[in-house]
Amino acid sequence: MKRILLCLLWVPFLLSFGLLLAQEDAARYLDALQKKYSGLKDYTVDVNVHFDVEGFKAPDMQAKLYCKPPDRMKIESKRIFFLPKEGGTFNPLMFNKEDFEVKFLERLTHEGRNGVKLKLTPKKRKPNAPQDFILTVDTDRNLIKEMNISSPDGREVKALMEYGHFSDFDLPTRIELHLDMQFNESREFKDFGPPSQPAKRVTGRVEITYSNYKVNIGLSDQIFNETDATKLKKGF
C-alpha cells in the first residue's frame, strides 16, 4: 500500500518534468534558427508584390528592401508601396525564445525532409498584434517553411516560403500569403479604389518574389533614418 501511495505521489512530478522537457526541446529549434542567421548583418533585395485578393485591385508593385537584423528595415520605391505587415517580410531573428511561450505540436515530413510544428504565443500581448504563430520548421536545414498567423480580431494569414542560397545564407526567393480577413480593416485599400463596402469576410493570395540579393555589405544606420524613408503602406 505504501509503495502504491509513493508511486502516486511521483506521478504529478514526472508529468510536470515531462512537460518542462518538452518545452525546452521545442525552444531548441528556435535556438537553431537564431544560430543559423547570427552572421547575417544586413542585406538589400529587390521585391515584387502581386495581389490576388477579392475586392482589391492593384498593379504589381516593385521596391528595394534594406534590412539590418534584428529590427531595422527600409523600403525604397518610386511610388506608394503596399506590403502585408504579417508574413510580408523575412526576419528569422524575430522568433526569440525569450519572447514566446513555445509549444511542440508534432514531428512531420515536409517536402521529403524532417520537420516539426511549433506553436508560439507572445509573452507580452500588443494591441492588434498576432495572437499565435504556428511554424513548420525544416529541421534538416533549419528553415521556416510555413507560418500560420492568427490575430485577436479574426485575421488569418498563412505564409508558404521558398528559399535560395545567397552568400552562405538561405534567404527567401518567394513568399506566398493566403489571407482570410475583414475587407474594411485595411485602410490602405482606399488608396487604390473607391471607398470600401460594409465589412465582409474575404480571402485572397499575395505573392512576394525576391531577387538581386546583396548580403553583408555594411549598410549604414543613416539609411534607416525616418526622414529619408520612402512612403510605405502596410496593411492586413
Positions of PLM-derived features:
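Edge/loop elements at the starts and ends of beta-strands within beta-rich repeat scaffolds
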Residues: 36-43, 56, 111-113, 140, ...
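Bacterial N-terminal signal peptides
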Residues: 7-17
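Positively charged n-region of N-terminal signal peptides that target proteins for export
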Residues: 1-4
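Gly/Pro-enriched, hydrophobic low-complexity segments
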Residues: 114-225
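An acidic-aromatic
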Residues: 52-111
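N-terminal leader/targeting segments and the immediate start of mature chains
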Residues: 18-48, 52-54, 234-236
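Extended lipid/amphipathic-ligand handling interfaces
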Residues: 32, 63-68, 158-167
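A short, amphipathic edge element
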Residues: 25-28, 94-105, 155-158, 207-208
